[in-house]
Amino acid sequence: CHIGDIDAERSQRGASDMELLSVTMNDGVMPRSEIEGKDNSSEDKSNYKVVLTGDMVYNSMRMWQGANGISPCNGIVSPAYTVLMPKIPISNGYFAAFFKSPNLINEFRKNSQGMTSDTWNLKYPQIETIKVCIPALSEQNRVADMLGTLERRIAKQAHLVDCLKKYKRGAI
């Protein structure tokens, strides 16, 4: 199937009273209020796009770098972002990982338009034509559960490494 068989573009606008969201490379979609740094958003947010919980949001100019994520909450994003809403039942955990997988990121790069990487852009008409192989929902859920377990184990090991480094510094 194609991405367009799974997701449709959401272009609803005009809900400027909703929380402003942002897409980060590492943490996906999150409230802008939780991100350090200057807020470059427009004062007039009437043209900002509506995002609902479970929507995939991506930065059209940085999708080839993996600037995307599944939204954990309702909100609005800059008109520069593309918002995809699921057409079929999907596992958010699976799709969050799938859209950052090296093979799919490579497809995003190949389908982006522009003269140089500084100007590459991937809009919905291009992304909807990308072919993908999607497992059944039950398999998506199993993969997402496994990835979640691995992430938790990695976090525990990272914490252990930090503790050992502190212990080592204290021993010297």
Model-found features: residue ranges?
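A short glycine-rich beta-alpha junction/loop motif
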Residues: 75-82, 115-138
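Hydrophobic aliphatic residues
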Residues: 6-7, 25, 99, 103
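Short coil/turn segments at secondary-structure boundaries
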Residues: 16-23, 111-112
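Short, basic/aromatic beta-hairpin or loop at an interaction surface
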Residues: 24-37
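Short, solvent-exposed loop/turn positions at domain surfaces
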Residues: 42-45, 116, 148
